[in-house]
Amino acid sequence: MQKYLSEARQLLALAIPVILAQVAQTSMSFVDTVMAGAVSATDMAAVAVGTSIWLPAILFGHGLLLALTPVVAQLNGSGRRDLIAHQVRQAYWLAGMVSVLVMIVLYNAGYLIGSLHNVDPLLSQKAIGYLHALLWGAPGYLFFQVARDRCEGLSKTKPAMVVGFLGLLVNIPLNYVFIHGHLGMPALGGVGCGVATASVYWVMFIVIRAWTNRAKSMRDIQLPQRFSAPDWKAIGRLTGLGLPVALALFFEVTLFAVVALLVSPLGIVNVAGHQIALNFSSLMFVVPLSLGVATTIRVGHRLGQGSAEQAKVAAWTAQGIGICMACITALFTIAFRERIAQLYADDPEVITMAAQLMLLAAVYQLSDSVQVIGSGVLRGYKDTRAIFFITFIAYWILGLPIGYLLGMTNLLLPAMGPAGFWIGFIIGLTSSAIMMIWRMRRLQRQPNATVLARAAR
């Protein structure tokens, strides 16, 4: 029991700064929406539409770079710190190449927005302008993620937390300047949010890079100042490890986007209730997501130390903590669902719909916790292909089709509207949780030599 308590303390010490960093990042999006909404409803809608395109594109790159965390953790645990700088340099090369692709996608997003039916021309123009401003922040965001993954792989999660809140503090005045036109700048409205956010991402990268250059704990793994050509073999390994995670993130983000589109013809009450429940459950998701990041670090570090048994302890301790926290957040959601809905809206019908959907959201928080921490465990074991297949099957083969049948058709039951899709979420996430646990157990039953050899690749 003592080894589990000791591991729990170390996991929480890593996870709490990650939770706060995620809160800071989520708050930036909230601030953008509120400050754009103060100009006009059109500006707020333009930011919302632009963000719905930005997120899948940038999270694909983010997922690709998550491969760096277990690589650094394993090298650090095995005492091969001299190899870390080379891996980080290749991750910067990878981030630069992915940035170009993301920028091309965002620059041409106008074709996607234009293909949507009945979109107000002014909204379309502002959304495209927002994306064209924001795309210049893509390299800064991805370079920041490389520096963050480097720190987290070394069990240093506080720098990203501090820099995240610094970014939030910088974002507010920059929004004010570019949205309303101060200090000689033109008033750009919602487009100004894109300019401000892109600038903030570069500020965050510069600050965290400066910190890593000066940190005493990282002096032995400083990046060489001279130019070095990309190591395509190392980049290929990082891509092979990160691509399944990137695709899994893409599947998840696009799933919720597709459901939002499918719910949209069901009327304002249904759409608003669905959006409120989804927004609140996304806030609750920050806790298990951060635990998943901490679990990747601990499992990778233990495997680097050559202890498959201690990696197993880290994995199951994280699942235990996650289930306990999910029970707390689920009970909180059930107890205060109506009051929470009232924070978002004052329409009684919308509040009732949101409160009903939050009951379903409370149910899926348990499965969501198990599956996202399971994904963190598998990343630590460098078994990322399994994450891709599990996510695809759970979300797109099971969750979405069942949700559509229950929500929009009478084939199984009378059409349930948004509730049907939420039942689909529960089925998909529960399936994912079961498959993640099955995969964890299968990996842990393999000979220690096999597990350690995979981790050392």
UniProtKB/Swiss-Prot annotation:
What residues form the membrane-spanning segments?
A: 11-31, 53-73, 93-113, 127-147, 159-179, 188-208, 243-263, 276-296, 316-336, 357-377, 386-406, 418-438
Q: Which domain of life is it from?
A: Bacteria
Q: Where in the cell is it found?
A: Cell inner membrane
GO BP terms: response to antibiotic; sodium ion transport; xenobiotic transmembrane transport
Which organism's genome codes for this protein?
Erwinia amylovora (Fire blight bacteria)
Indicate how the chain sits in the lipid bilayer.
Answer: Multi-pass membrane protein
Q: What is this protein called?
A: Multidrug resistance protein MdtK
| Molecular function per GO | antiporter activity; xenobiotic transmembrane transporter activity
Q: Name one GO cellular component term.
A: plasma membrane
Q: Which family does this protein fall into?
A: Belongs to the multi antimicrobial extrusion (MATE) (TC 2.A.66.1) family. MdtK subfamily.
Pfam families, per this entry?
A: MatE (PF01554)
Q: What does this protein do?
A: Multidrug efflux pump that functions probably as a Na(+)/drug antiporter. Confers resistance to the hydrophobic cationic compounds norfloxacin, ethidium bromide and berberine. It provides protection against antibiotics produced by epiphytic bacteria, such as P.agglomerans, which cocolonize plant blossoms.
InterPro entries linked to this entry: MATE_fam (IPR002528), MATE_MdtK (IPR050222), MdtK-like (IPR048279), Multidrug-R_MdtK (IPR022913)
Write out the entry's keywords from A to Z.
Answer: Antibiotic resistance, Antiport, Cell inner membrane, Cell membrane, Ion transport, Membrane, Sodium, Sodium transport, Transmembrane, Transmembrane helix, Transport
